[in-house]
Amino acid sequence: NTATVYLLGSVHFMRKDIYPLDSKIEDAFKKSNILVVEANINDAAKADIQRLMANAYYPGSDTLDRHVSRETYDLIKKETERLGIPIQMINKQKTWIISLTLSSLELLKLGFTPADGIDMHFLSRAGGKRIIELESVDYQIRLLSSFSDREQELFLLYTLKDIKTIRQEMEQLLHTWKSGDTKGMELLISKGNSGDAQLAPIYEKLIYERNRRMISRIEEFLRTGETYFVVVGAAHLIGDRGIVRALMDKGYSVEQN
């Protein structure tokens, strides 16, 4: 009855020209004494980085070509050659880290960087605010590496397809984000996986299972007398199975500013 939780959908790769943010957002941040993020990248322990390296590479003599089809391997080779990266440089990398690397490189070329991401913007300005992680770097690494070879390959194929239209999609995402158009953002984000039933189990683990965990934590916050500023990926907030809808269904008062 006494807690306030501000929810802000993050875009993890952002452009500098998005700043300064709307004063309503900054005012909510100033009013909050606790900052909540998915994972505190600034505080990522050395052990987390070592765990990332261990989970991102095939052990021993194992290589990428043993884990994807010949057709997919050729597509990866074509894409890396376009980027000026010899296939030999990534042949030890697992498929999930290649997916993240390829999409990240495209975003960087378009001027979107993780350093300018919404979550990093607030982490860098947390000052004396207490910082709470809804997840952790370690949890996210374990989640991504838990997918089967086939699931990782499907996600990579989706990434290779998505890269072709990433400029247009990011511009649309920026427009919906800045205008607070949750329906437009929902359509944009769901468009990518709606046509492929094989992606549904992946989306279930990447979004909906994590939503349930986050909702449980946010409910804990709402039972305190504190004011929280929660920054999570925008995809977690929107839609019929998103965090906002779940909180409303549970009887909490939710308003969009």
Q: Language-model segments: which ranges?
A:
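A cross-kingdom marker for long, charged
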Residues: 201-257
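Structured, acidic catalytic/metal-binding patches in enzyme active sites
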Residues: 1-202, 206
